[in-house]
């Protein structure tokens, strides 16, 4: 740590009334661009309007102005999020069976959407139990509400109104901090202050207040609910907060107040701050006392972290010093210059944030089922499948976004003149070695992973099961994964005092947990089938990385187009007269990367869906016999391509295909419609621009003949626009098809 003389006092960091509020200006389409503001000559105008409306770099090159626009837009985003949350809570209050579900969560399904019988579509209101008819929801909101101690629909109403107030507040803040008091550039670049506020404020105090809420409100209310007390009889949250004796009846140490804390007799608090591991056998969720303890610990860590950086007082770390000291023996200048990059290029900053948030989202997907945090979440199979799928897709998109903004940084913000021998420069100088090695890895993984399946299909087709790779013939056991599982299964009692079970039941060792005759979780066995599909995961992920990384490393120049940086982030080809230079822009790499991201995530969610139905989810008899949904067929069926097609896609599609005439029929329509949207995308992806331009000119001729030709000239989509429309419909169609397939299946059988 470097101790310096105090920094000069903070200057005034806002400009007053920098930009007037003008509805006349905003009402003019394309007011942000001289060219677009002139109005349309051709139909390309509307596409350019959409492409550039939020590309603040194209409006101005003034970093301060760009920063203010981004900052203001963030408040708008928060406003929309609050509005959405309010809608969710309002549906819970107005259209849901939450109170009924709360009284019997094992036999009643969650529903917060009731279809109005306008054209006879009330068939969609299925019987979710308890005499309620509505659409079964799979968002997990009911489970979150129970975990946070919400016991009535009135409380949901109040929260919904509160969220609306916050939405309005955020809208106001977005306007205020752009038009009335706009921060100066120095404020956006003061990273130490930002770290202090975000770490100590958002994460530290945020976690602390959540831990406080859990201890004082959630834990007592959930204890009553678990004991079967009628929600209407349970004291209201404010009674627990104001009346300590009420809590002391449940947790005797509350009678002593803060004395044990100040006398360091902290073990007194172990009644409500536990470290048990495993799941609560009543609800099938993590112990809420473990979760409260976790948030308290996280709060302490982040409150400390928030005090590590040097601001107005001359004590603490400076980010620039940390980065410039970050040198290894083989990395030249190391991170020198990175501080300047990250404080002047928001694309570089965003790229890092997206990569980390995307990875974190995928980590969340894997923890939601292996350590289900909310009561009765683990036995709600449709919600479990939805949460996993949702977080996987979101994580995939965020990671592709990271590559997109890294490439935009390279094209727009990277200045090669003052970068020499730092880490980025060194990576760029040996990019050929990186990409060619990565390419070799992809070829190796592709041939070998698919080769194992093709071998199995061939042996199966020839009637030679003894020569297949399977748990019953030639075994390829995932020994490293099994070793990790065993290590974790044996960990309790060694890692933390009082820990009675491992972090997740999936590791093994523990008994299964069942709630209301349904399996919540049990040790997940891994075998040859998992080994095979794991290598498909490795293959698809490496190909996605190859495409995205090549796009970033060759964004500015390549042997084919040495001056690529001058052509920008997205361009169709390197001008006329240079054949073979189309589809090489950084944008095109993002475009291609999206398809492989889609491949990668699809295999993951298919693996998860089938594995859980085969080896985890199911019912348990009074004698303790478990019957899985697909009877454990994953290990023997998923080892051939044919098995995936026959026993997963075809066999499990029967529910969505046969859904007509039932309350699941909307999924049947979506399944059909989303296939159509997906097929529609191929029209854009498989045909060239000239084809459409010729067609349009014939159609324009016909319009002229009839004297109904429009003033705005029709134009075919540009190459880049066509590919953008194509990939959008491809992903939208593919994801919605998967959604309908998964939900119709799991709601019917789960």
Swiss-Prot record:
Q: Where in the cell is it found?
A: Plastid, Chloroplast thylakoid membrane
Q: What class of enzyme is it?
A: oxidoreductase
Which keywords belong to this entry?
A: 4Fe-4S, Chlorophyll, Chloroplast, Chromophore, Electron transport, Iron, Iron-sulfur, Magnesium, Membrane, Metal-binding, Oxidoreductase, Photosynthesis, Photosystem I, Plastid, Thylakoid, Transmembrane, Transmembrane helix, Transport
> Which is one GO molecular function term here?
electron transfer activity
Could you give the cofactor binding note from the entry? P700 is a chlorophyll a/chlorophyll a' dimer, A0 is one or more chlorophyll a, A1 is one or both phylloquinones and FX is a shared 4Fe-4S iron-sulfur center.
Which Pfam families would you find in this protein's record? Answer: PsaA_PsaB
Listed under catalytic activity are: reduced [plastocyanin] + hnu + oxidized [2Fe-2S]-[ferredoxin] = oxidized [plastocyanin] + reduced [2Fe-2S]-[ferredoxin]
Binding locations of [4Fe-4S] cluster: 573, 582
Where does the chain bind phylloquinone? 692
Keyword flag rRNA processing: no
Please verify whether the record's keywords include Metal-binding. Answer: yes
| One GO cellular component term | chloroplast thylakoid membrane
Membrane protein topology class: Multi-pass membrane protein
**E.C. numbers:** 1.97.1.12
Q: Which residues bind chlorophyll a'?
A: 675
Q: Please, one GO biological process term?
A: photosynthesis
Residues binding chlorophyll a, per UniProt: 683, 691
Q: What parts of the sequence cross the membrane?
A: 70-93, 156-179, 195-219, 291-309, 346-369, 385-411, 433-455, 531-549, 589-610, 664-686, 724-744
UniProt family annotation: Belongs to the PsaA/PsaB family.
Spell out the subunit comment: The PsaA/B heterodimer binds the P700 chlorophyll special pair and subsequent electron acceptors. PSI consists of a core antenna complex that captures photons, and an electron transfer chain that converts photonic excitation into a charge separation. The eukaryotic PSI reaction center is composed of at least 11 subunits.
What does the function comment of this entry state? PsaA and PsaB bind P700, the primary electron donor of photosystem I (PSI), as well as the electron acceptors A0, A1 and FX. PSI is a plastocyanin-ferredoxin oxidoreductase, converting photonic excitation into a charge separation, which transfers an electron from the donor P700 chlorophyll pair to the spectroscopically characterized acceptors A0, A1, FX, FA and FB in turn. Oxidized P700 is reduced on the lumenal side of the thylakoid membrane by plastocyanin.
What is the protein named? Photosystem I P700 chlorophyll a apoprotein A1
Q: Which organism is it from?
A: Aethionema cordifolium
Q: What lineage does UniProt assign to this protein's organism?
A: Eukaryota, Viridiplantae, Streptophyta, Embryophyta, Tracheophyta
């Amino acid at each position: 740590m470097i101790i310096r003389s105090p920094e000069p006092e903070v200057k005034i960091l806002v400009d007053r009334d920098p930009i007037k509020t003008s509805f006349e200006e905003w009402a003019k389409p394309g007011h942000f661009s001289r060219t677009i503001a002139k109005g349309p000559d051709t139909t390309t105008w509307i596409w350019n309007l959409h492409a550039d409306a939020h590309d603040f770099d194209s409006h101005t090159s003034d970093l301060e102005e760009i920063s203010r626009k981004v900052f203001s837009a963030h408040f708008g985003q928060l406003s929309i999020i609050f509005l959405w949350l309010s809608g969710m809570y309002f549906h819970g209050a107005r259209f849901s069976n939450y109170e009924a579900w709360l009284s019997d969560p094992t036999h009643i399904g969650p529903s917060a959407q009731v279809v109005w019988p306008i054209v006879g579509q009330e068939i969609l209101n299925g019987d979710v139990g308890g005499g309620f008819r509505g659409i079964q929801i799979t968002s997990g909101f009911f489970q979150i509400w129970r975990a946070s101690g919400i016991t009535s629909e009135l409380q949901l109403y109040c929260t919904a109104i509160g969220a609306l107030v916050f939405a309005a507040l955020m809208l106001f803040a977005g306007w205020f901090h752009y038009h009335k008091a706009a921060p100066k550039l120095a404020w956006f670049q003061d990273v130490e202050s930002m770290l202090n506020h975000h770490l100590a404020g958002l994460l530290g105090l945020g976690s602390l207040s959540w831990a406080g809420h859990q201890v004082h409100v959630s834990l007592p209310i959930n204890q009553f609910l678990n004991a079967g007390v009628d929600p209407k009889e349970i004291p209201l949250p404010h009674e627990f907060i104001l009346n300590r004796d009420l809590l002391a009846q449940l947790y005797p140490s509350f009678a002593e107040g803060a004395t044990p804390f100040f006398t360091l007799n902290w073990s007194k608090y172990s009644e409500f701050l536990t470290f048990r591991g495993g799941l609560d056998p009543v609800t099938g969720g993590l112990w809420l006392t473990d979760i409260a303890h976790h948030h308290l610990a996280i709060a302490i860590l982040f409150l400390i972290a928030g005090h590590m950086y040097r601001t107005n007082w001359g004590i603490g770390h400076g980010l620039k010093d940390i980065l410039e000291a970050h040198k290894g023996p083989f990395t030249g200048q190391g991170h020198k210059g990175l501080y300047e990059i990250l404080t002047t290029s928001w694309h570089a900053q965003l790229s890092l944030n997206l990569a980390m948030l995307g990875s974190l989202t995928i980590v969340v997907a894997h923890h939601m089922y292996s350590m289900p945090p909310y009561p009765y979440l683990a036995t709600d199979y449709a919600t479990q499948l939805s949460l996993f799928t949702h977080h996987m897709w979101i994580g995939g998109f965020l990671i592709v976004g990271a590559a997109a903004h890294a490439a935009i940084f390279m094209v727009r913000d990277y200045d090669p003149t003052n970068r020499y021998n730092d880490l980025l420069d060194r990576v760029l100088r040996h990019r050929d070695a990186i990409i060619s090695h990565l390419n070799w890895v992809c070829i190796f993984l592709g041939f070998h992973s698919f080769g194992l399946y093709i071998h199995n299909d061939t042996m199966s087709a020839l009637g030679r099961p003894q020569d297949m790779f399977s748990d019953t013939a030639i075994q390829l056991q995932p020994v490293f994964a099994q070793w990790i599982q065993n290590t974790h299964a044996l960990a309790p009692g060694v890692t933390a005092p009082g820990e009675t079970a491992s972090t997740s039941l999936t590791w093994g060792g523990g008994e299964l947990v069942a709630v209301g005759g349904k399996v919540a979780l049990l040790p997940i066995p891994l075998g040859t089938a998992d080994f095979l599909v794991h290598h498909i995961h490795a293959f698809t992920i490496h190909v996605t990385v190859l495409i995205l990384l090549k796009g970033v490393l060759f964004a500015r120049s390549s042997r084919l187009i040495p001056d690529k940086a001058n052509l920008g982030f997205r361009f169709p080809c390197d001008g006329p007269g240079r054949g073979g230079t189309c589809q090489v822009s950084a944008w095109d790499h993002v475009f291609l990367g999206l398809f492989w991201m889609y491949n990668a995530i699809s295999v993951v969610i298919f693996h998860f869906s089938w594995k859980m139905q085969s080896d985890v989810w199911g019912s348990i008899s009074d004698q303790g016999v478990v019957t899985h949904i697909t009877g454990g067929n994953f290990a023997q069926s998923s080892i051939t391509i044919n098995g995936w097609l026959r026993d997963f896609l075809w066999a499990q599609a029967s529910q969505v295909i046969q859904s007509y005439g039932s309350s699941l029929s909307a999924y049947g329509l979506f399944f059909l419609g989303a296939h159509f949207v997906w097929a529609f995308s191929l029209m854009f992806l498989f045909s060239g621009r000239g084809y459409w331009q010729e067609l349009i000119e014939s159609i324009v001729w016909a319009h002229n003949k009839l004297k109904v030709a429009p003033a705005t000239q029709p134009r075919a989509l540009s190459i880049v626009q066509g590919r953008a429309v194509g990939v959008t419909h491809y992903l939208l169609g593919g994801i919605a098809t998967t959604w309908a397939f998964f939900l119709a299946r799991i709601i019917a059988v789960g």
